[in-house]
């Protein structure tokens, strides 16, 4: 490595907000299944605190050694609906509290996996878990919940979609931050290191390290150097920058897995913004030539960014996974917040952007008097985009306040202006229930 590359890396960290967003340890809880819920909770606490006892210390050591900030250390676990189903309990709050207690004990920022996979219907534990979510998120600090309601292979479980509209409303009513820790997915992935949607898939190894990187500021600085150049050069510049970012992510992941004695899983290539100025995906899109995110051309700019990030990242790391694209959370990106506040960006445009990016309607505040059926219909629209396009989509929305209010979450979650929703009813549509069948192109065999 020559001195120019060293200087480049230092600049990435000091001036362009480059960091490793998360080291996430995935832990299987299948060996914690017990017909007694209290014993299951004990086993869960014991396994997490044993396997992840050194996660935070190792993360801090690597950050100090490399001089690269590692912002979050997290844990994801087997979907709790699978563990709870073996018990006769009618509420999985004890399991949520066991997760929270373990997270506090080992010092991680979040623990994900209070989850259910219901893309084709409910099993015994699924409905119980879903109905436990509002209380579980209100009475814990670090637990994150997710529910997968659709997939390209299975279609969309519209009964679950209706239920999740209601649950999001209840969660927001019971706690200020609860809805920010709840994600509804279509095509959820098993190796996602990012919260709030992380869970440890049943096809994964017993314990795995997954890494999520962050570098919108680095990409923006690189694009500043190619102002006015063609899209070919733009794409190549993003690709090369993503390569550098991902290489560092792989190094951190390998070091962490070696020191913790567990398997290295994947690097998630997602560009994840923060509320800090200079760490915004929206500003990257504007650097391409848009006056403000949300104007015509935004979706095309996002398509170029997303694809070039993937191409550069895949070259840099032999194991990529997770969500891997560009995140467009409103509350966590100062450029997105500005675009909403000046009227350039609305929900309809955000929905179009989710056909391209790596998640969906993320960290968006809507009026608290929005009917649950409207929330469910928003979930259905997002799920349809994911199911038809064979990609992951998600909804993380917070019904709070009224249009124009600013909802403060604090920390990495930032603040969100409350956005207007379409006032016409979707209630009769949502009341139908049942399953939207899988699309014809899902039949590959």
UniProtKB/Swiss-Prot annotation:
Pfam families, alphabetized: DUF711
Disulfide bonds: none
Complexes and interactors: Homodimer.
HAMAP family: UPF0210
Similarity-based family: Belongs to the UPF0210 family.
PANTHER family according to UniProt: UPF0210 PROTEIN MJ1665 (PTHR37560:SF1), UPF0210 PROTEIN SPR0218 (PTHR37560)
Protein name, UniProt field: UPF0210 protein SUB1511
Lineage summary: Bacteria, Bacillati, Bacillota, Bacilli, Lactobacillales
């Amino acid at each position: 490595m020559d001195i120019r590359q060293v200087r480049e890396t230092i600049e990435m960290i000091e001036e362009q907000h480059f960091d490793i967003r998360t080291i996430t340890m995935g832990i299987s809880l299948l060996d914690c299944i017990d017909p007694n819920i209290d014993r299951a909770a004990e086993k869960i606490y014991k396994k997490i605190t044993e396997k992840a006892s050194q996660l935070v210390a190792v993360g801090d050591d690597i950050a100090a050694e490399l001089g690269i900030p590692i912002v979050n250390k997290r844990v994801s676990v087997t979907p709790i609906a699978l563990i709870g189903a073996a018990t006769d309990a009618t509420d999985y709050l004890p399991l949520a509290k066991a997760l929270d207690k373990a997270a506090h004990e080992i010092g991680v920022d979040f623990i994900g996996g209070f989850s259910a996979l219901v893309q084709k219907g409910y099993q015994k534990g699924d409905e119980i878990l879903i109905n436990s979510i509002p209380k579980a998120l209100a009475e814990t600090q670090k637990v994150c919940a997710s529910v997968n309601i659709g997939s390209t292979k299975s279609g969309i479980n519209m009964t679950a979609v209706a239920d999740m509209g209601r649950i999001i409303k209840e969660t927001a009513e019971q706690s200020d931050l609860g809805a920010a820790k709840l994600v509804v997915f279509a095509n959820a992935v098993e190796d996602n290191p990012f919260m709030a949607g992380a869970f440890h898939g049943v096809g994964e190894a017993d314990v795995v390290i997954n890494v999520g990187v962050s570098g919108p500021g680095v990409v923006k600085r690189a694009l500043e150097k190619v102002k006015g150049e063609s899209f070919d050069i733009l794409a190549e510049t993003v690709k090369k920058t993503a390569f550098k970012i991902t290489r560092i992510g792989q190094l951190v992941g390998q070091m962490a897995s070696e020191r913790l004695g567990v398997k290295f899983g994947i690097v998630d290539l997602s560009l994840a913004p923060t509320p800090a100025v200079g760490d915004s995906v929206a500003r990257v899109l504007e650097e391409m030539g848009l006056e403000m995110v949300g104007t015509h051309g935004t979706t095309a700019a996002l398509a170029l960014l997303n694809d070039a990030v993937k191409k550069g990242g895949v070259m840099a790391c032999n194991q990529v996974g997770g969500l891997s694209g560009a995140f467009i959370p409103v509350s966590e990106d100062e450029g997105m917040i500005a675009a909403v506040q000046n009227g350039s960006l609305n929900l309809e445009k955000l929905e179009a952007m989710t056909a391209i990016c790596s998640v969906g309607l993320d960290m968006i505040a809507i009026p608290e008097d929005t009917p649950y059926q409207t929330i469910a219909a928003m979930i259905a629209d997002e799920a349809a985009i994911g199911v038809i396009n064979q990609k992951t989509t998600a909804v993380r929305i917070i019904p709070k306040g009224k249009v124009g209010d600013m909802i403060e979450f604090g920390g990495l979650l930032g603040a969100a202006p409350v956005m207007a929703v379409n006032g016409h009813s979707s209630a009769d549509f949502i009341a139908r229930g049942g399953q939207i069948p899988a699309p014809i192109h899902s039949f590959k065999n």
